């Protein structure tokens, strides 16, 4: 995944950008970078790995050595960014957030038809952000170039550029799958993935960039260069999983959505007659916790933290690329409260069940510490498809998805014809899917939030949400 923060100011903005990037550390653990503009020095850039050292430690001295009135910084789990590029537009810094799935075709066109070349390599592969810059450069200006990029890519791309005059151009991806939010202060403007960061640094909410919209930001004003469109497909997973609890996207707060989502799940369990006789409701931390609070409030059962995640030295474990690393980190940071586990019937809510490996270890851990029963609820529907538009999951093959693996075990690839039935817990296939996962992971019971319930909890029109990973619909 990744996140970004930038400022255009009348004064040095490096402190603001340092803290602004740090507040996006939950979105990645691999790379971080910053580019800034100073009228005397010009453009500067630094990129470092943050796999073993947190951003604030790795970049503290870096920011002390840089100065500028304009800066953008990012967390990136894909390629080193931002890049400094020199083209017919002059020198500029560029950052891209998204996922492009037809890069091989685009690279071939670039080599064969334009006789281009690339300088930046990542593990022997072409840096996708440099490819993005090369495509933009094919047109006569940034606006036409970004629109051309959106026309030919498969996937999504939000673009942020620092021009050589110190202004920022920001373009939200064509269907607005991820947010670009702007705040205003007396000395200038900031742009951010997470809305809460703007307020923490003294910026008042000013504007959410629309899907496909392109704006230019100076210290004095924000100018729309291209209006974009009305159609939106913002990622619904922002609210259920990876968005920060204090943020809002399209006016809908993450924490409140999770409370409401849990409430709807508990209500559905009551209606379907599958509410459980339990001692406590708990959340799989961190993002499962507010879903669980909502579930507990509606069910009338007490909420309790049967285990605590040790966070001072362990970062989020969904990011490391190997399953072994993810499992080890997940296990190391779980600390039990035995008095809340031993002899107890527990119901846990997790934000999602993707591969299921870590969740199995969590349930085994609870049984090892004396749990009598462990019931599980997923705050979103079964994940049936890998995302084609964003890189928020470490899964590379769809057969890593537990729902797909179970379907193949039950009736082979023929079962893929009945994905909708498997997602629905009321159908025979849906019941078999849940029963098989229960047997594999030792759950006493399992249910998933329905897609309708999830959309209701978010509170946006269904047509404005991307739900591809659950139903395969574009």
Give the positions of each predicted feature.
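Conserved short alpha-helical segments that host acidic/polar catalytic motifs at enzyme active sites
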Residues: 1-210, 216-279, 284, 373
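Flexible loop/turn segments at secondary-structure boundaries
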Residues: 12-14, 102, 168, 177-178, ...
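PRPP-dependent phosphoribosyltransferase catalytic core
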Residues: 165-167, 172, 202-206, 363-474
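Active-site proximal loops enriched in glycine and acidic residues that flank catalytic Cys/His/Asp
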Residues: 172, 193, 219, 282-286, ...
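Long, K/E/R/D-enriched contiguous segments that form extended
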Residues: 271, 276-317
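Short, glycine/charge-rich flexible loops or terminal/linker lids adjacent to PRPP-binding catalytic cores
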Residues: 297-345, 384-396
């Amino acid at each position: 995944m990744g996140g970004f923060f930038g400022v255009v100011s009348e004064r040095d903005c490096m402190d603001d950008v340092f803290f602004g990037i740090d507040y996006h550390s939950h979105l990645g653990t691999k790379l971080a970078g910053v580019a800034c503009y100073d009228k005397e020095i010009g453009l500067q850039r630094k990129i470092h790995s943050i796999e073993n050292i947190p951003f604030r430690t790795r970049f503290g001295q870096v920011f002390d050595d840089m100065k500028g009135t304009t800066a953008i910084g990012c967390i990136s789990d894909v390629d080193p960014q931002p890049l400094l590029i020199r083209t017919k537009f002059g020198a500029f810094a560029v950052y891209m957030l998204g996922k492009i799935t037809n890069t091989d075709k685009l690279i071939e066109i670039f080599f064969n038809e334009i006789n281009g070349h690339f300088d930046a390599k990542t593990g022997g592969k072409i840096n996708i952000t440099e490819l993005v810059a090369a495509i933009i450069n094919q047109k006569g200006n940034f606006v036409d170039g970004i629109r051309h990029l959106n026309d030919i890519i498969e996937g999504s791309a939000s673009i942020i550029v620092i021009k050589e005059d110190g202004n920022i151009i920001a373009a939200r991806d064509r269907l607005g799958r991820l947010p670009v939010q702007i705040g205003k202060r007396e000395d200038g403007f900031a742009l951010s993935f997470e809305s809460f960061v703007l307020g923490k640094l003294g910026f008042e909410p000013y504007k959410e960039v629309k899907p496909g919209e392109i704006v230019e930001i100076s210290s004095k004003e924000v100018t729309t260069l291209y209006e974009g469109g009305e159609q939106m497909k913002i990622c619904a997973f922002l609210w259920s999983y990876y968005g920060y609890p204090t943020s809002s996207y399209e006016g809908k707060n993450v924490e409140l959505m999770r409370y409401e989502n849990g409430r709807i799940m508990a209500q559905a369990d009551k209606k379907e007659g599958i509410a459980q006789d339990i001692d406590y409701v708990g959340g799989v931390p961190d993002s499962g916790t507010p879903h669980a609070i909502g579930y507990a409030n509606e069910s009338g059962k007490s909420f309790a933290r049967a285990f605590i995640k040790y966070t001072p030295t362990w970062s989020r474990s969904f990011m490391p690329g190997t399953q072994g690393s993810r499992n080890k980190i997940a296990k190391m940071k779980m600390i039990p409260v035995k008095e809340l586990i031993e002899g107890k019937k527990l119901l846990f809510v997790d934000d999602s069940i993707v591969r299921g490996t870590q969740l199995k270890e969590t349930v085994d851990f609870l049984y090892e510490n004396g749990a009598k029963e462990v019931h599980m609820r997923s705050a979103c529907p079964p994940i049936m498809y890998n995302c084609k538009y964003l890189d928020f999951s470490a899964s590379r093959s769809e057969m890593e998805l537990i729902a797909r693996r179970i379907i193949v075990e039950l009736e082979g690839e023929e079962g893929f014809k009945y994905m909708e039935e498997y997602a629905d817990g009321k159908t025979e296939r849906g019941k078999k899917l849940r029963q098989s996962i229960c047997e594999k992971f030792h759950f006493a019971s399992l249910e998933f939030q329905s897609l309708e319930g999830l959309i209701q909890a978010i509170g946006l029109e269904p047509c404005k949400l991307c739900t591809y990973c659950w139903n395969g619909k574009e």
